[in-house]
Amino acid sequence: MPFNGEKQCVSEDQPSDSDSSRFSESMASLSDYECSRQSFTSDSSSKSSSPASTSPPRVVTFDEVMAAARNLSNMTLAHEIAVNENFQLKQDALPESSLAGRVRHIVHQAFWDVLESELNAEPPEYEHAIKLFEEIREILLSFLTPGGNRLRNQICEVLDTDLIRQQAEHSAVDIQGLANYVISTMGKLCAPVRDDDIRELKATSNIVEVLRQIFHVLDLMKMDMVNFTIRSLRPHLQRQLVDYERTKFQEILEETPSALNQTTEWIKESVHEELLSLSEATLTPGAENNSKPSLSPTLVLNNSYLKLLQWDYQKKELPETLMTDGARLQELTEKLNQLKMIACLALITNNMVGALTEGLPELAVRLKRISAVLLEGMNKETFNLKEVLNSIGIQICVEVNKTLMERGLPTLNAEVQDNLVGQFSSIEEEDNPIWSLIDKRIQLYMKSLLCLPSPPRCMPPVPGGLAVVQQELESLGLQYANIVNLNKQVYGPFYANILRKLLFGEEATGKAEASSSTN
């Protein structure tokens, strides 16, 4: 309808294919206007595939860049639909206080005011109303399945705009009757969640307000239809996701050779760390060791995945192969950091007052709840962690003393309380031993999950000191393992090529050079 083309957004803030296409078309037009052809030279494309290569740099054209963007948009959308059970489309509601929101409200109101004045005129002017019914007819027809011929014919017959115009010319048109038919038809086609909206439409007497609300409910029904289609597609996408994503990424790689640069650096960093660790472990003082340490590709890749649990998602760019799961990994990491902090607080509390509170599981639950509530949002930049840890320490002391008093036991003295609060506050300090210990144990637990078959038959045992967060840790661990296992299935061949070059490339090159010198 006029003035009703609100932009729709994808929940989870994912880009839509249509937005990408419109952007591509507008940019292509601009490119044609400014120059006959615009091209971009990728940094990685200028690098030779081997040290001896003298091939000229590959030029990536503008069209190839935009084609890669469309492929990435399609792949991201398909991935989100398949792995996110809560994914749905929803309308983008502009804040009423914003300039855009106020402008839209004014323009909409002006349109409906004009329509009302036309219908109240003597004689009434029906042309705008007829155009609205024409648009309503097309929307209703779009909801029908191919087999709905009977209802299709009925809609076309009742909302025949040529006939309505003839009736209007003779002042015989029944606008209210047409609106009632539309509402009745909407009631047959809508999802049960819209039944209340249909009842409100039937109870509205002002014809202009009825038409206005009809379009509002039709917009909701369109979203319902799209989300129903998404739910129907999800099982099919889940079955085809691995092949689809791998094919799309291969197309992106062909159009943009630099599409694996960040991924290569991500894996290379793990290779260097593992080589350093292995060298330090195997090097004997005073002995000469000329052999190159051998690394397991699986070990290197798993350690690369573990690095994502300590990633700075605000400042550090993700590997290209993990872009589709970036938001999930960031959320998982933030929740994991909160669990680490809760486990640290519980361990300190248990070490200091565990003997006094032994056999009081309800107290442990209360202390955990206090920590979890106060640590909510701890990953935000504005969060004052030291102050919150101090507050948690004070609250813990209050709860422990309250429990001890209820059982007629002596409360914690001031020295113990100060010591407890002080240890809590020191957790945020760099290289804190308690934090390092808990972090290492959680890393070991997550690493053990990556070695299990998918799906795992049973969960591995939780390391000591983590029992207080066992349930939450197992849940996050399963989410993490599912993300990693799906990512391995999709991008395994690309990782294999990168690992082959990083782990065996120099050796292969050396053999080739030795062979050529012998000949």
Swiss-Prot record:
Subcellular location: Cytoplasm, Cytoskeleton
InterPro entries: Tcp11
Upregulation: Gradually increased during muscle-derived satellite cell (MDSC) differentiation.
Family: Belongs to the TCP11 family.
Coiled-coil blocks: none
Residues carrying Phosphoserine: S16
Alphabetical UniProt keywords: Cytoplasm, Cytoskeleton, Phosphoprotein
Single GO cellular component term: cytoskeleton
Highest taxon of source: Eukaryota
Sequence ranges of Low complexity compositional bias: 17-29, 36-55
Protein name, entry field: T-complex protein 11-like protein 2
Principal place of residence: cytoplasm
One Pfam family linked to the record: Tcp11
Record carries keyword Cytoplasm: yes
